């Protein structure tokens, strides 16, 4: 396994210039142990019952990454280096416990083989960073789209889960949330 790297952006979401680059290993350490991220995640999750307040807090407080690679600016045409990963976002699960169960089950999936799996900012969802092969005879966009749609179809067929299709854009922001029990595949 290779170590994927991606752009890291400080909050708020209106900040489109990355503050740096991080690896999946660095994200593992940050998501599982950073006390400031833990406090921000708790503040965001305090408003999960009020969708407008939750969305506003998530967008103003939480940092985010672009799992598909390194970008000079958070826009698809500004990709500098692809990571070989894409994000799968499963939302609207019934409970935090169900989210943790799916995090663990999907991380163990032998077809998906995620590099990273954590409970999403809303606590009732899961985010997976899934590796894919870049095809030398295809464009980057085609390789990315093909892998993403294949994974979505597989998730629905194998697990009965619908992924959030808003993540079809390579530069799509993936908000980070504290998860002491996230799962990580070391290279």
Residue ranges, per PLM feature:
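Aromatic- and Lys/Arg-enriched surface recognition patch
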Residues: 140-178
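Signature for HUH/AEP ssDNA processing cores
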Residues: 1-124, 132-147
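Conserved small/polar residues in nucleotide/adenosyl-binding loops
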Residues: 184-187
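Short Gly/Ser/Thr- and Asp/Glu-enriched loop/turn motifs at secondary-structure junctions
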Residues: 119-125, 168-173
């Amino acid at each position: 396994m290779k170590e994927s790297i991606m752009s890291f952006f400080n909050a708020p979401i209106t900040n489109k210039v990355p503050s740096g680059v991080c690896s999946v290993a660095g994200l593992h350490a940050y998501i599982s142990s950073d006390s400031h991220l833990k406090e921000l995640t708790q503040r965001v999750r305090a408003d999960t019952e009020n969708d407008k307040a939750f969305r506003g807090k998530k967008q103003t407080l939480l940092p985010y990454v672009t799992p598909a690679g390194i970008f000079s600016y958070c826009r698809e045409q500004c990709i500098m280096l692809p990571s070989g990963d894409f994000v799968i976002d499963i939302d609207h699960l019934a409970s935090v416990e169900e989210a943790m169960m799916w995090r663990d089950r999907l991380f163990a999936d032998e077809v998906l083989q995620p590099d990273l799996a954590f409970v999403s900012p809303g606590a009732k969802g899961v985010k997976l960073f899934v590796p894919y092969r870049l095809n030398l005879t295809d464009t980057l966009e085609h390789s990315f789209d093909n892998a993403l749609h294949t994974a979505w179809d597989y998730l629905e067929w194998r697990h009965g889960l619908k992924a959030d299709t808003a993540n079809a854009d390579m530069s799509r922001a993936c908000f980070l949330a504290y998860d002491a029990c996230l799962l990580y595949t070391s290279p």
